[in-house]
Amino acid sequence: MIKQYLQVTKPGIIFGNLISVIGGFLLAAQGRIDYPLFLATLVGVSLVVASGCVFNNVIDRDIDKKMERTKNRVLVKGLISLKVTLVYASLLGIAGFALLYVAANPLAMWLAVMGFVVYVGVYSLYMKRHSVYGTLIGSLSGAAPPVIGYCAVSNQFDAGALILLLIFSLWQMPHSYAIAIFRFKDYQAANIPVLPVVKGISVAKNHITLYIVAFAIATLMLSLGGYAGYKYLIVAAAVSVWWLGMALSGYKNAIDDRVWARKLFVFSIVAITSLSVMMSVDSMAPAHEVLLTYLR
């Protein structure tokens, strides 16, 4: 039973978000780490993300039964009652919001609320089922965790927070489109209007390429704005160029789109993890030492 309650929170998504929270937090901390705040932020965001995932499982149970990848999920098989699941999700969310408010600051809590509302209320309940722009809206909620981590320390939404929002939102797009391509039949069967299904895979490839270019520019802004150092800059540039090269390889005539998309998806995880690690490590230089000053 405990395993089922854990599964419904989507632990993989929680773990992925924690990596980005750590990146945002340590970027803002600049080497001066408040460990109680760090722990509280990680736990608070984890609880909020878990709550959102449980609510998403409730909302998507009719869709999940149509998809090969999700047909064996806990709620699809009726292993937990709907009423208990809703109470469980609510308690997780309340605990997460309360912890962020008390242990971090109101800004971090309200950012978590906004991310939660966008994911559950806007994306899951409506946009995912009715609009090709659902992925774009969902990307905003996916970018919330690193911004929460950053603002838990800074207690302000500054240029650094905005750049993080851009980086992680732009990353979500090619990442999500890649999933939709190699899981094309699942999305088609569930009648989910993702771009590859609605507009075709060739159009999706164009969007993927453009979003990766935009992502690359956004990642460089973190160094050029003085929030991360040259080591981060080198890794960001290398990761972006490699990811773009992989995207461009998708235009070859003999390419297997499903295999290509899966590789692109896997590398997207490598890319964002690398950036999260590097912004954590290379943020320990003096705050706001603008890289451009070294180039004059």
Swiss-Prot record:
Keywords associated with the record: Cell inner membrane, Cell membrane, Heme biosynthesis, Membrane, Transferase, Transmembrane, Transmembrane helix
Membrane topology recorded in Swiss-Prot or TrEMBL: Multi-pass membrane protein
Signal sequence extent: none
GO cellular component: plasma membrane
Involved pathway(s): Porphyrin-containing compound metabolism; heme O biosynthesis; heme O from protoheme: step 1/1
CDD domains the record matches: PT_UbiA_Cox10
UniProt record, GO biological process: heme O biosynthetic process
GO MF annotation: an example: protoheme IX farnesyltransferase activity
Compartment annotation: Cell inner membrane
EC number: 2.5.1.141
First-listed, main subcellular location of the protein, grouped into a coarse class: membrane
InterPro entries: Protohaem_IX_farnesylTrfase, UbiA_prenyltransferase, UbiA_prenylTrfase_CS, UbiA_sf
Paired cysteines (S-S): none
Summary of the function given for this chain in its UniProt record: Converts heme B (protoheme IX) to heme O by substitution of the vinyl group on carbon 2 of heme B porphyrin ring with a hydroxyethyl farnesyl side group.
Miscellaneous field: Carbon 2 of the heme B porphyrin ring is defined according to the Fischer nomenclature.
Protein name: Protoheme IX farnesyltransferase
Species of origin: Pectobacterium atrosepticum (strain SCRI 1043 / ATCC BAA-672)
Gene: cyoE
